[in-house]
Amino acid sequence: MLSGERKEGGSPRFGKLHLPVGLWINSPRKQLAKLGRRWPSAASVKSSSSDTGSRSSEPLPPPPPPPHVELRRVGAVKAAGGASGSRAKRISQLFRGSGAGGAGGPGTPGGAQRWASEKKLPELAAGVAPEPPLPTRAAVPPGVLKIFASGLASGANYKSVLATERSTARELVAEALERYGLTGGRGAGDSGCVDAYALCDALGRPAVGVGGGEWRAEHLRVLADAERPLLVQDLWRARPGWARRFELRGREEARRLEQEAFGAADADGTNAPSWRTQKNRSRAASGGAALASPGPGSGSGTPTGSGGKERSENLSLRRSVSELSLQGRRRRQQERRQQALSMAPGAADAQMVPTDPGDFDQLTQCLIQAPSNRPYFLLLQGYQDAQDFVVYVMTREQHVFGRGGPSSSRGGSPAPYVDTFLNAPDILPRHCTVRAGPEPPAMVRPSRGAPVTHNGCLLLREAELHPGDLLGLGEHFLFMYKDPRSGGSGPARPSWLPARPGAAPPGPGWAFSCRLCGRGLQERGEALAAYLDGREPVLRFRPREEEALLGEIVRAAASGAGDLPPLGPATLLALCVQHSARELELGHLPRLLGRLARLIKEAVWEKIKEIGDRQPENHPEGVPEVPLTPEAVSVELRPLILWMANTTELLSFVQEKVLEMEKEADQEGLSSDPQLCNDLELCDEALALLDEVIMCTFQQSVYYLTKTLYSTLPALLDSNPFTAGAELPGPGAELEAMPPGLRPTLGVFQAALELTSQCELHPDLVSQTFGYLFFFSNASLLNSLMERGQGRPFYQWSRAVQIRTNLDLVLDWLQGAGLGDIATEFFRKLSIAVNLLCVPRTSLLKASWSSLRTDYPTLTPAQLHHLLSHYQLGPGRGPPPAWDPPPAERDAVDTGDIFESFSSHPPLILPLGSSRLRLTGPVTDDALHRELRRLRRLLWDLEQQELPANHRHGPPVASTP
């Protein structure tokens, strides 16, 4: 009966029971919705001295330089003649990442967006070494540049100027002035006129629609005279919603606007716009790169190589006001570093002037300022000191630690996304995930099989992460979590510090106290005693004790021992599921669910066999079958109804946990992980077994209830409610006040209602249980009514009035019990058939077949014709010709079935939504608390049995104040 067979959709399929009616219950397969969302990644470690930009979200490789320009990577630019000239560049590489490629490479997800914290230090140091000159590129065809006058001239908005790859900004300014007529009568090549204007690279938002307003530049950069605008234009593109154009402005005005914009960007700090980044890239790649100011003791900084003479001659022209500000800021930072050196011990005795400019780089790396608006991790112990960084900043709400790895060859699945790369051999590709939203606390979740410790304790499932907590990854890495956004709202002392640091030993008991937390053995014993006797809804166990614990809970529920509340077994089992989902390893929950479902199935099967032995279907010959009374059927079905109620709530609770598992996998990008897929398959099998238990208990319950109703329903057609001296009861009357012929049937309904209420069955299942009982009653009574009218005079007005009265009394009583709507719906066809028979004879003789079909559409043509053809009009009188069906409906009358089918009952639909189990707050039910204490002490005894005899002791008892 509880077969493991399943349909294609995944729902279980049951064999038919030996019922007096055809009972087939289908359960629609419940699908768990998958939700997930991925977070974008972008940020960098703050560095006040960096002038190299971080990569944009869509990096574009710079085009090869013209033949006479030597182009180097931005992160590797080094002034000839002095190492200190590129000091700021190298520091910028360390904290911001160079523009020449990421650690991930082109094939790695986000390879062009990796941060300096994800790179290896040798790769960054290698960027300082000189590189061979890049090969020259092919000639670029001429292009047309639109140069806007930006209010300098009236008339056309822009002028088109022909430019080549060798055209400089100064040459294009001269040509644009000539096109706009701003030369003032002098030649276009007049240097005084050209010097008064500058070509600007502007970024802004275009006007929307017709007449939507003027185009306004929000970011501006003055091109140096020697820069090539045609090459600058090809270096990068504006993001959606932005527009880029070249503008002709007065040189003084352009410098003032650029300086104001640059000052605003400096005030923004790390979050300045990416325009500053693109400005440096454009200037470097188009031949106008500004060289760092020479440091102390360095050479003149004159560039060498191809085109060096030209660049040295135009050096002053290529520097903008913003670049001069950079040089001044670098000098001030260098002075502060020298001042820090002078404050070192022994500075008064010896002059601390480093001869090697690299000493300034090393000192700058030590002067790290932690971010003030993002959580970060402080490295306490690493794997390779030469490659590990000190601060790892969380750039997204979800931060992933791991080793990374190549893309999977099967199915082309991408490599796992990792924010911080750790190269220790025991670090998994995705080791652990930290989620830190706007509100504390943060959550840390280890990946499957990843060794992770939290404040020195092994971490198996998700846990809260507070500022100051220690997070250990593998055997090498140890981090401290910091969140400057909390503003001191976290705990005053980290939980891993001793509780009483520096306190004097209180006495001999100090020798038996814990050195880590500072608690004595007595204090720890009191904490254990508080757990064993506490009312918190927590049940802790080890995996080795799982089988004994689950078996004890199911055995106690099956035997009915104790006075547990109706949903007590489901509550205890849900506590086991919750402990496994929160505390134990990731793969433990599917195994626990499978074992739990099998135990419940076996217990229900044993109970069904016991009831079947006491109520056999086939009785021995000569032994009359004794019908079940409402009281007897209530006693027999109570264990099954209890299991149906508990399994329904447990199923809803387990579905929530499985849905959480899928959501977490989607958020971490592990939805296609083979181990996760295997876990979900095991969970589906466990859910299918619980479905099977619910449907089987429902099937057996309605079987015995309908079996009892089968012997009581005929009285509704035969009994006369108008007996001598009897008064008809009103709505809401008690069962004892009802006519004797109706009491047995109403007694079955009342017993079922009380049983489902006492067992706290889900309201949806209560409605479906009575829906099936009313469906069976309607079909059984209607079939009996059709059958009785064939051989004897039964269809009479007087008999119909008695049946109508009995039916009204039953419906009124069910209305008072809260079941009126369901009863009215399922008794509709019987009510219509009885209403037809209650029509007075004179009125019925005036009706025609078409009018009767219109007034009683629920009856089939065969049923209507059967009632009319056997209606008793009087001795020797037959039905009138007006009652004959037309030829179009004659076939339906002759071939139609007058009996109702029992196989058209509504299917069983399992309840959806959240579970009614409440696992928050203290346990208020005393019986449930006693059972919880008993199970905790059982687990304590199992743990003590594993210890040597001389180490065992009884459960601790909390000391009374």
From Swiss-Prot:
Keywords: Angiogenesis, Cytoplasm, Golgi apparatus, Methylation, Phosphoprotein. One of its GO terms (biological process) is positive regulation of cell population proliferation. It is found in: Cytoplasm, Perinuclear region; Golgi apparatus, Golgi stack. Residues 1-10 have a biased composition (Basic and acidic residues). One of its GO terms (molecular function) is protein homodimerization activity. Residues 41-57, 284-295, 314-327 have a biased composition (Low complexity). Residues 59-68 have a biased composition (Pro residues). Required for the proper formation of vascular structures that develop via both vasculogenesis and angiogenesis. Acts as a critical and vascular-specific regulator of GTPase signaling, cell architecture, and adhesion, which is essential for endothelial cell morphogenesis and blood vessel tubulogenesis. Regulates the activity of Rho GTPases in part by recruiting ARHGAP29 and suppressing RhoA signaling and dampening ROCK and MYH9 activities in endothelial cells. May act as effector for Golgi-bound HRAS and other Ras-like proteins. May promote HRAS-mediated transformation. This is Ras-interacting protein 1. It comes from Mus musculus (Mouse). The lineage of its organism: Eukaryota, Metazoa, Chordata, Craniata, Vertebrata. The gene is Rasip1.
